[in-house]
Structure formats: structure tokens, C-alpha cells
Amino acid sequence: MISLRQHAVSLAAVFLALAMGVVLGSGFFSDTLLSSLRSEKRDLYTQIDRLTDQRDALREKLSAADNFDIQVGSRIVHDALVGKSVVIFRTPDAHDDDIAAVSKIVGQAGGAVTATVSLTQEFVEANSAEKLRSVVNSSILPAGSQLSTKLVDQGSQAGDLLGIALLSNADPAAPTVEQAQRDTVLAALRETGFITYQPRDRIGTANATVVVTGGALSTDAGNQGVSVARFAAALAPRGSGTLLAGRDGSANRPAAVAVTRADADMAAEISTVDDIDAEPGRITVILALHDLINGGHVGHYGTGHGAMSVTVSQ
């Protein structure tokens, strides 16, 4: 008969064996697990290094492509606007770099910028519709001129008025706007808070216009995109060509470029470019203006939704 002591010793031996098994087993599995994790970690680091190298290589290629565009851009646009002039309108979200780049490339194309006129936040938000309408319909309209009766919203009417004042009408029968009348229109809109510009001795008329806007607009931007699109479209009949240019994201609603492309009437009036923040887009601005001034068709260019091609076909 097994004594109590022997029974206790047997149980102790069993528990000891179990404990040793657990310890040895856990050590084995933990070593295996750690070894596997170390291997996976090395593989991940290898993948990260490879992806980093690929990213750096792509960045170098993009940089080289941008530098190439910058170097050859002036040759591509050479004499495209020789003897022609352009007035630039900018929205509150337009970038200074884009304005400077457009002004520069107009000069490289042989053209001249007559003025850069800024539309204020009050203008694009359209919260002062009656105030703007009263200014537009006041006695500042140049003698012999008439606003289009088809345009009823204040943004379009303001575009029509500024088109009369600042653009050379392609119709030789159109009345000539004197400098004093032009100054009156600009001063009235500036004093009422709708535009700003750097006063010069003389802001002459231009053959064409570029309206420069920003990129994507937030969904709570209200009617800003619509206001800018209608303004740009209203300028078109008064000169030899109007182009609306925006940055990456401008081809998405509710931005002005997207609004223009989605509206058949506006899309038939003005050209658009949706990548003015890149050198190819700036080159396209000049090529598109050249087409418009010389009687070509409107076009919609860039890489965003609604673009018909990346640039103007030759």
C-alpha cells in the first residue's frame, strides 16, 4: 500500500515535470517566435529601403522633367503673344507664385500685362449682391456702351462692365473707351470694396484676359466657384479671348474651373487650365491664349476632370 508520503512525492514529481515542460516549451516557442519576428523585421526594413530608393528616383525624374519644362518653356511660347496684351484678374485664393509665373511667361511670349486686378472676398462670396449691382448699373458705364441684357446676376454684370472698360473689343464698330472712363470704372469698384489694384499712371486696354484662381474649394465655400466662373464667362465677348486657370484640384466641384466645364454655355465661351501650379500648365495658358486671339476654338486643358487634353494640340 502506497503511503501518504510516497503519494505526495509522486504528485510533486508530476507537477515538477509539468513545470519543466512548460518552461522548456515556452522557451522553445518564444525563441522561434522571436526569430520569426526578427526575420520579418529585416524583410520590412529591406522593403522600406527599396521603396525609399524608388521614391527618391521618381522625385529626381520629376525634378528633371520640371527643370526641362522651365528651360524649354520660353522657346515653346516664343512670339506666341507678340504685340498682344493681357489683363490678369486674381481671386482671393490665387497664389502669388502663379501670378508672378503667368506675368513672366506672358513677357517671354512677347506680350505685355496691362494690369493685375484682384477680386476681393466680398466680390466672390456674392454677399453684397445689391451693393455690387447698384455700382455696376450706376452712371460709371462708359458712354456709348451697353451691358448685356442676358446677364442678370451681379458677378456676370461686373465681368461685363470690366470687359467693356479693360478689353479691346474685336468688333471695330464698338465704341472706344477713353482712359478717363476706364479710370472711373476701376475707381468705383475699388472704392466700394469689390476690387483692388496697384494704381498706375495708365491702365490701358488688353486683347485678352486670364482669370487666375486657386485649387480645390471646400464644400462650405458657398457660391464662390459659381461667381468666379460667371465673372470669367462674362468677360469673354468683350475681348479676343478669356482663359480661367486654376491649380491642382480646381477641376473638382465646387471650384470655378469645374463649374465652367460642367456648364455647356460657359464651357463654350472660355478656355480653362487646371494645372497652373506646374510649368506645363503655364505654357498651356500661353498656347491657349494664342489660339483664342487668333480666332481658334476654346479648349479645356490639364489633368483634372473635364480636361479635353493635357495641352493645346499643334
From Swiss-Prot:
Q: Which Pfam families match?
A: MctB
Q: What happens when the gene is disrupted?
A: Mutants show a severe growth defect in the presence of copper. Deletion causes a drastic virulence defect in guinea pigs, mostly due to a much lower bacterial burden in the lungs.
Where is this chain's protein located in or outside the cell?
Cell outer membrane
Query: Where is it chiefly localized?
Result: membrane
Which GO CC annotations does the UniProt entry carry? Answer: cell outer membrane; pore complex
Q: For this UniProt record, give its keywords in alphabetical order, as a comma-separated list.
A: Cell outer membrane, Copper, Ion transport, Membrane, Porin, Signal, Transmembrane, Transport
Note the InterPro entries from the entry: MctB
Q: Per the UniProt record, which residue ranges are transmembrane? A: none
According to its UniProt entry, the protein's GO biological process terms are: copper ion homeostasis; monoatomic ion transport
Question: Which GO molecular function entries does the Swiss-Prot or TrEMBL record give?
Answer: porin activity
Q: Which domain of life is it from?
A: Bacteria
UniProt keyword Transport, yes or no: yes
| Signal peptide residue numbers | 1-30
Q: What does this protein do?
A: Pore-forming protein, which is involved in efflux of copper across the outer membrane. Essential for copper resistance and maintenance of a low intracellular copper concentration. Required for virulence.
Q: Which family does it belong to?
A: Belongs to the MctB (TC 1.B.50) family.
Protein name listed in UniProt: Copper transporter MctB
What organism does this protein naturally occur in? Mycobacterium tuberculosis (strain ATCC 25618 / H37Rv)
Gene designation? mctB
